[in-house]
Regions:
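Cystatin/cathelin-like cysteine-protease inhibitor module
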Residues: 18-127
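Sec-dependent signal peptide recognition
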Residues: 2-7
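C-terminal motif of bacterial Sec signal peptides marking the signal peptidase cleavage site
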Residues: 13-16
Length: 127
């Protein structure tokens, strides 16, 4: 009897782990309506010094078949140290269920053919 009770408790506990999982593929691929604020927030963790960014540009979210996820490409030039800038960089922000999931460094296929527009908000980040 104790084993059955223990198994029931464990099943209920593990059942709660999947509580916030997306219901379907359409939920997983929800359009990232707040993609700019999500990217700005993530850049604070991604960059050692998020201030003084130059030449920032961004693409609109595009559903890429290779990943089956929405992708937003970002170009920018960040500080290398207090006196120098690094080379221009391009990264891809991957979205899952309409929320930022991760960055991909040196994207090739993910950013092929996208159109970039100015992203002044990224250039105004504070520490």
């Amino acid at each position: 009897m104790q084993r059955i009770s223990l198994l029931l408790v464990m099943a209920l506990a593990l059942g709660g782990c999947g509580h916030n999982a997306p219901d379907s593929d359409s939920d997983i691929n929800a359009y990232p309506a707040n993609y700019k604020p999500d990217i700005l927030a993530a850049m604070h963790a991604y960059l050692n010094d998020p201030t003084g960014i130059r030449d920032a540009s961004i693409s609109e979210p595009v559903l890429k078949s290779s990943l089956s996820r929405y992708v937003v490409c970002v170009r920018f030039t960040a500080k290398k140290n207090a006196k120098e800038y690094a080379a221009p960089k391009e990264i891809a922000a991957i979205f899952l269920a309409g929320r930022f999931d991760r960055f991909i460094d040196m994207p090739k296929d993910e950013c092929a053919g996208v159109t970039f527009t100015a992203f002044p908000e990224l250039q105004k980040l504070t520490p």
